[in-house]
């Protein structure tokens, strides 16, 4: 049996797995829990961890996430259940977030762990015309997340390093040594500091924009309890392609919005 695709690759087989139309059983489940007929289905581009489709039922748009990758039960068991609990919890966070509609956590009806949630208007912005406004819009979200009252123990799991099938450098990296050093650091001690509610995967690809304003924050399956610097640091890494000045500006704006220091 061949190894599953590298966690940072999207080869042809993975792309087909994630983008293909959901099976009839999954769409029948949607119809049964919503009480209407599926009118349209479209794959949503983005992450590599699951198959995500925009589904229209009786004129209402909703998002169907199916954890179809075969390595998911090993890399992150219980992820669908955790996402469902996170979506319930973020209802109290004062930012637009998806609303949980239904779950098939064991995949009894749909074949794989499945979540149905509300759709949020907006689109991901990777080429902002106003860089400072773009950064400010993101940094203003973080204090609202981190200031949420902590849930009861066990509702949201503590921060941990991502687990996956392989930590080997992907074939496209030009600096495998730097990659391996980054993996070592990521698996080191958890940063110190006051623990708060975290998005855990906070970066531009999960922030939706509409008419120049933030319209939503999506992908809550990695939500955790840990130091605020985890969300800040994760986003900093994802901003490196814009240059270190942008990374530093993001950090400064977050410090201004939160009243905290990034160490």
Please annotate each region the language model reported:
Residues 77, 128, 229, 247-248:
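Conserved strand-to-helix beginnings and helix N-cap segments that scaffold or border functional pockets
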Residues 71, 89, 124, 207, ...:
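Conserved protein kinase catalytic core
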